[in-house]
């Protein structure tokens, strides 16, 4: 979903949305609980119709007022479903196909877990398993489940994240993510940093937003061996990525554009993506939207191109109940000119609490 810049005082980061239920509020300590059930009934090409979990969650937020604008905060988010990997093997035991089965309610697990401090008018500093400010970059994705081209370091299990308060519509921040394995002999896969700036301004019915981010992280790359060995060997390489986006809105109409590019050191070719989204709010409850994505990846002479078009309609039965219908048509064309189609249609329900 699209990330929106919200004009809030930073001390309110520890507080929750309007959907939250406050279960404790005494002596400067506040605890809120909220969440949402997100289900999609969908049909993809070459698959049967399926009912899947689209990120259902329950979150617990706590804050304690330390005085003089300073507060301590903590956040935990639970999810309920995890995909299960499946391998199809031939009679010789060789893997011929791999895919994931989308489960529903099969695995309760902690998705986010972090704590930190907020200082009113300055910003928040948090430590733990969390989204980084890189996840906030992107303005063109108005869909519920079919698009998005964010290529930045957007989350980390062991992350330190800073996000400033809003200054005249401008917000900035950065994050550092540690590698999963601290052993000096282990690969540094996932370790990196991200910086980003966000600007949002509204004058009457006209709104403008601009966002940009840059990140570097280590990624695991297989080492080519000659002759090929039975045991695969991997090494660290750096992936550098940037993303910029802009949005122009007037009353209920909004047009967003994002561009993303990434490159892995010592690997030929870059990955480039352009996304254009259009959203129109018919009224306070209903909206229609469309989204276009163009992607290109690979070295010269071996480039793969992807094209995706998505359209949808969303309707709020209640301020906390959303329904939608969405469809997308994807085309992937390899360097030999072979085209693979990937179409999907779905209808969904989100109940917030």
Curated annotation (Swiss-Prot):
The lineage of its organism: Bacteria, Pseudomonadati, Pseudomonadota, Gammaproteobacteria, Pasteurellales. The keyword Hydrolase does not apply. GO terms for molecular function: porin activity. PANTHER family: OUTER MEMBRANE PORIN F-RELATED, PROTEIN YDDL-RELATED. It comes from the Bacteria. Keywords: Cell outer membrane, Disulfide bond, Ion transport, Membrane, Porin, Signal, Transmembrane, Transmembrane beta strand, Transport. This is Major outer membrane protein. GO terms for cellular component: cell outer membrane; pore complex. It is found in: Cell outer membrane.
């Amino acid at each position: 979903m699209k990330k929106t810049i919200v004009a809030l005082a930073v001390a309110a980061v520890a507080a929750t949305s309007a959907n939250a239920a406050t279960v404790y509020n005494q002596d400067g300590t506040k605890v809120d609980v909220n969440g949402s059930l997100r289900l999609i009934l969908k049909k993809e090409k070459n698959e049967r119709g399926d009912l899947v979990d689209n990120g259902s969650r329950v979150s617990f937020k706590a804050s304690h007022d330390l005085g003089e604008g300073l507060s301590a905060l903590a956040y935990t988010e639970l999810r309920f479903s995890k995909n299960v990997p499946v391998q199809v093997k031939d009679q010789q035991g060789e893997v011929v196909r791999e895919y994931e089965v989308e489960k529903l309610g099969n695995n309760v697990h902690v998705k986010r877990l972090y704590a930190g401090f907020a200082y009113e008018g300055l910003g928040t500093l948090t430590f733990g398993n969390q989204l980084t400010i890189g996840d906030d970059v992107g303005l063109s994705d108005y869909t519920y489940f079919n698009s998005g081209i964010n290529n930045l370091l957007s989350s980390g299990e062991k992350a330190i994240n800073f996000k400033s308060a809003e200054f005249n519509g401008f917000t900035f921040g950065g994050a550092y993510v540690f590698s999963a394995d601290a052993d000096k002999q282990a690969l540094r896969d996932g370790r990196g940093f991200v910086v980003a700036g966000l600007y949002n301004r509204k004058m009457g019915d006209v709104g403008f937003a601009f966002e940009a981010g840059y990140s570097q992280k280590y990624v695991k790359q297989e080492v080519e061996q000659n002759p090929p060995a039975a045991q695969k060997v991997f090494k660290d390489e750096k992936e550098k990525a940037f993303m910029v986006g802009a949005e122009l809105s007037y009353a209920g109409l909004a047009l967003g554009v994002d561009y993303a590019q990434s490159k892995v050191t010592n690997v030929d070719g870059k990955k480039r993506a352009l996304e254009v989204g259009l959203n129109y709010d018919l009224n306070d409850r209903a909206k229609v939207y469309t989204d276009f994505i163009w992607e290109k990846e690979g070295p010269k002479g071996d480039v793969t191109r992807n094209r995706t078009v998505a359209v949808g309609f969303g309707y709020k039965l209640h301020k906390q109940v959303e329904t939608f219908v969405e469809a997308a048509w994807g085309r992937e064309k390899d360097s030999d000119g072979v085209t693979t189609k990937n179409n999907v249609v779905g209808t969904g329900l989100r109940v917030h609490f």
